[in-house]
Amino acid sequence: MTAAYLPSILVPLVGLVFPAIAMASLFLYIEEQQIS
């Protein structure tokens, strides 16, 4: 039952949330390098 609507939650999570976290961490890394 759970597996029916699991992909509809998992796909946006991987497709939107993970790149957002990756860009945010990369942005913070670049900012940290510029300050130092």
Curated annotation (Swiss-Prot):
CC annotations in GO: chloroplast thylakoid membrane; photosystem I
Keywords noted in UniProt: Chloroplast, Membrane, Photosynthesis, Photosystem I, Plastid, Thylakoid, Transmembrane, Transmembrane helix
Signal peptide residues on this chain, from the entry's feature table: none
Membrane topology, as annotated: Single-pass membrane protein
Cell compartment(s), UniProt: Plastid, Chloroplast thylakoid membrane
Pfam families, A to Z: PSI_8
GO biological process: photosynthesis
Residue ranges crossing the lipid bilayer per the database entry: 9-29
Principal location: plastid
Cysteine pairs bridged by disulfides in the record: none
Role: May help in the organization of the PsaL subunit.
Membership in a protein family: Belongs to the PsaI family.
Name this polypeptide is given: Photosystem I reaction center subunit VIII
Classification of source organism: Eukaryota, Viridiplantae, Chlorophyta, Ulvophyceae, Oltmannsiellopsidales
